[in-house]
C-alpha cells in the first residue's frame, strides 16, 4: 500500500541546539555564517546573548534570549531551555547539545551546572567542564574559528563562505525607510563609524584623523554623510562629527537596514563595520593597532587600510573611498 503523500512529505524533526553568543557586535556578526550553517543542517537554534543581539539577528528568525545578569539567573534560563528541548527531542541529553562560543571559564561552568553537554574551546581550565573541548586556535580568523566548531558538531568540513549574508527583517527595513524619510537621507549616502569599543594591545582603536576626514574630505563626493552613535557616543558624535547627519537611538537591526542602502561605510575596527560588510555594503576599514588576520571585517567588498607602522594617512583612506565609489 503506498504511503500517504502528506506523511511522506513531513520534514525530519529539528534538533534543539543552545548557543551562547559572544559579547561584542563584531563577534556575533562573524558567527552568523556558522549559525546559518547549523540552521541549514537541521538544528533548531536557541541563542543566548546581549540584549542587542535580538535586533541584530532578527532577519534570521532565530529565538534570541537576553543574557541574564547573574550566574543564578543564567543557569535557570539554561535549565528551562534544556527542559523544553528534552520535551521535543528524546536524544537531547545523549549528544552535544550546546555550543559555547565565548572562551570564558564562567560560560562553561554555567553550562555544566545546568546539566548541558557543551562544545567549546579548552581555555582557562575549562576542559573538565565541557563535554568536548577543542584546542583554541591562536592565529586563525574568528570567523574560521566558529566555522571549525561547526565542522566538529556536524562531523563534516565545508569551504569557508565568501560573504556573511546577514539578513534584515521587513520591520527593520520599514523603520529605516521611515527614518530616512524624516531626515531626507537618500540611498547612496556615506556612513561613518568613528567609534571603537575597547583597545588592542592597550592601544586606542580610534583613527585620530577621523573628525577632519569626515568634515573636509568625505563631503567632496557630493553625498550625505551619516553617523549613528551607539549608547554613550552621542556627545562625541555631536561635538566632533556635527557636520554629518547624526541619527541617535538606532537599534542594530535598523542600522543594518540603513547600511544596506548606503554607498559606503568608513569605519574603525568596530561592530558596525562588520555589519556593513555582512549586508554586502562596501566597507573601508581603517585600522591602526588591530591585527586584521584575526578580526578583520569579512566580505568581498571590504578594503583594509592600515599604515606600515600605525595609522594610515588621510590620503590613503581617501583613495580607498574613491575606489569603492567608482566600483559602485
Feature locations, PLM:
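Catalytic machinery of carbohydrate-active enzymes
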Residues: 1-328
